[in-house]
Amino acid sequence: MPAYMTFFPLGNADTTLLRLANDDLILLDYANMRGSDPTDKRIDLPKALRDELDDAGRDSFRVVAFTHLDDDHICGASEFFWFDYARIHQGPDRIKIDELWVPATAITEPDLEGDAWSIRQEARHRLKEGYGIKVFSRPERLAKYLAEWDLTIEQRQHCIVDAGELVPGFSKYDAGQCEFFVHSPFAWRTNTGLEDRNEGSIVVQMTAREGNSESYALLGADINHETLSQIVQTTRKHGNEHRLHWDVLKLFHHCSYKSLSSVKGEDITEPVEDVRWLFEELAREKEIIVSPSWPIPEKSTQEDLDAQPPHRQAANYYKKIIKDSNGQFKVTMETPTRSNPKPIKLKITAAGVAVVFTAAASVSSAAAAVPTRAG
């Protein structure tokens, strides 16, 4: 059975839905950004996700991952999901989470409010009770917090997953035909020992298998080029270059130039070497790059002068690198058109990854396009 990936039009915000071969649903981030203005082109995310659950025959998400706790990744989560820690977040209209994935800061960060506070409370509750959670962290980073609950790392090891590991519970050889390799958060070795880096952000490589074919996607939170370079260096050091291959790349930080370099450039952002190697050498043929963002601005417009992403210069780099491999560059808020953006749905089969009809409401009604990679 094929797997599917869906990217929702939410402006500069992230929500990605993975539908595995067995119809289990994995949600990466939840950002309900649509306002009350009827002209708002951003999708009604709660309705869209309920429709996806119905189409898959599921009443809960196998996994909900909050890749980091900025509002553009979690907005409205405390109003949509069933949280076990408090009855105020429970009710017949709320959607349950079988397993919660969070970065270390969802446990350790003291100064949170709103949706971030609620997610932290739910994460702490599940970790304390020892069920339904994976904390992406170096285990030692959580020792102090576990000790406050009279718990040890060993007692909660099954709830913790570190960089360089596969997330337990998933295999490309089981019914879901999918696995996840953890790149971040990670520890960076310095002269004084290990230093935790990017502990607020999850980055994973997804491998989806069908038949004898595998397809890969790089997915994660808002990280800059320095962190991305360290991920590349660490992965290469451990001989895991294959864990950086990708057919699908969900851009980090809404097509910001800062994920490529500290220098924006006049018309194109030239990446630092490690990032260039990742994006140019490890991309598979006919790759698909998705920018979860507002439309790419035209040169010299007011939007182009805005310091916030998306940045035209970064987009020009991505458009350049796909030309040699017949790839595709998609922007959530301009696909299929700027006036009427729809979810971008990718279908993963033994023939490769295909963009399916973006106006389709569900997998069962989607019309497939030509696969982006053969073999």
Question: What kind of region is each of these model predictions?
Answer:
Residues 1-63, 200-226:
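Conserved beta-strand hairpin/beta-sheet module of binuclear metal-dependent hydrolase folds
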Residues 27-31, 60-74, 101-105, 217-226, ...:
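Active-site neighborhood of phospho(di)ester-bond hydrolases with catalytic His/Asp-centered motifs
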Residues 13, 80-88, 165-167, 233-236, ...:
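Short alpha-helical segments and helix-capping/turn motifs at coil-helix boundaries
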Residues 226-332:
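Long, structured stretches of catalytic cores involved in phosphate-ester chemistry, encompassing
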Residues 1-3, 58-59, 75-226, 294-375:
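Flexible, acidic/histidine-containing loops and adjacent segments that form or flank the divalent-metal
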